């Protein structure tokens, strides 16, 4: 992940996608997210986190399996957390509801 994110001082909600290059379900989820990324970015910031390169962030959010998505509200609190592949409608529902 590039740059540093101050999770206690977010300007917008943020969706974190934790993945690994060797993970087949991660590739499936990435395809889903690629399809809806434009819609996601209208409402929240979107960051992909490779767990093999950013172990500190993986540990900070207690990510134990991938793919995992974590949606944080503007206060930096976890609003929604999902492990595994989910349909785009489920992702967008939460992206539209978070503040």
What residues fall within each predicted segment?
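A short beta-strand-turn-helix
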Residues: 1-13
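Short pre-active-site segment immediately N-terminal to redox-active cysteine/selenocysteine motifs
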Residues: 11-14, 18-22, 65
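Hydrophobic beta-strand anchors of alpha/beta hydrolase catalytic cores
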Residues: 15-16, 46, 69
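The canonical Cys-X-X-Cys-His
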Residues: 23-26, 69
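Typically the conserved alpha-helix immediately C-terminal to a functionally engaged Cys/Sec
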Residues: 27-40
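Structural microenvironment flanking redox-active thiols in thiol-disulfide oxidoreductases
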Residues: 51-58
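A short glycine-leucine-enriched loop at secondary-structure breakpoints
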Residues: 60-64
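Non-catalytic, surface beta->alpha helical segment in thiol-disulfide oxidoreductase systems
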Residues: 65, 70-99
């Amino acid at each position: 992940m590039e740059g540093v994110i101050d999770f206690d001082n977010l300007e917008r909600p943020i969706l974190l996608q934790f993945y690994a290059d060797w993970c087949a379900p991660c590739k499936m989820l990435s395809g889903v997210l690629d399809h809806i990324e434009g819609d996601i970015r209208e409402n929240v910031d979107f960051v992909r986190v490779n767990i093999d390169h950013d172990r500190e962030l993986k540990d900070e959010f207690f990510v134990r399996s991938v793919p995992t998505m974590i949606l944080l509200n503007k206060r930096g609190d976890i609003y929604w957390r999902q492990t595994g592949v989910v349909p785009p409608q489920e992702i967008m529902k939460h992206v539209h509801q978070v503040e």
